[in-house]
């Protein structure tokens, strides 16, 4: 998963997108963070038939960026392999199915407030903006999708 983050940061540099690549994302969320989330059973991945990871994220049942106690799964560190097509949408669909299986009503995430293409992507997948959040230099928009 960490390798995908590094690959995506390089892609952002190439595309002139200023997000993870200029915020020290790989230092805020180093390899040890992902190893810990894996050991806690909180890291999830979508793989191809050969076992290569196409998309991955950390799924949490609590998130300090949200102040309510609605039954939700919170998607963090979502990353897809560059060129993996609709892997992100497929991952989020499956994350929603998982959330329903464990009796959650919402799938929630946040994204950078200055990334309009990503905002449109999430809105097209049914995630509506419901507020903002701040984490150090990061300023984000909280989004949720009602599942039931």
Q: Can you describe what each PLM-predicted range is?
A:
Residues 96, 131-135:
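Hydrophobic, well-ordered secondary-structure scaffolds
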Residues 99-112:
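Conserved GNAT acetyl-CoA-binding A-motif
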Residues 134-148:
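Terminal substrate-recognition subdomain of acyl/acetyltransferases
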Residues 86, 103, 126:
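Short glycine-rich hinge loops at helix-strand junctions in the catalytic core
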Residues 122-132:
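Conserved acetyl-CoA-binding loop of GNAT-fold acetyltransferases
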Residues 3-15, 19-83, 92-94, 98, ...:
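Acetyl-CoA-dependent GNAT
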Residues 89:
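Residues forming the Rossmann-fold NAD(P)(H) cofactor-binding site
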Residues 109-119, 135-138:
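Conserved beta-strand-loop-alpha-helix junction that forms the acyl-donor binding cleft
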């Amino acid at each position: 998963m960490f390798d995908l983050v590094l690959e995506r940061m390089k892609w952002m540099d190439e595309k002139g997108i200023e997000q993870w690549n200029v915020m020290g994302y790989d230092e805020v969320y180093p390899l040890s963070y992902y190893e810990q989330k894996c050991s806690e059973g909180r890291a999830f991945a979508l793989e191809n038939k050969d076992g290569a990871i196409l998309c991955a994220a950390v799924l949490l049942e609590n998130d300090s960026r949200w102040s309510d106690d609605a039954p939700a799964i919170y998607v963090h560190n979502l990353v897809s392999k560059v060129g993996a097509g609709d892997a992100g949408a497929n991952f989020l669909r499956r994350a929603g199915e998982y959330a329903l299986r464990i009796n959650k009503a919402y799938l929630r995430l946040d994204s950078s407030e200055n990334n309009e293409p990503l905002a449109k992507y999430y809105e097209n997948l049914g995630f509506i903006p419901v507020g903002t959040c701040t984490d150090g230099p990061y300023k984000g928009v909280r989004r949720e999708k009602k599942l039931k």
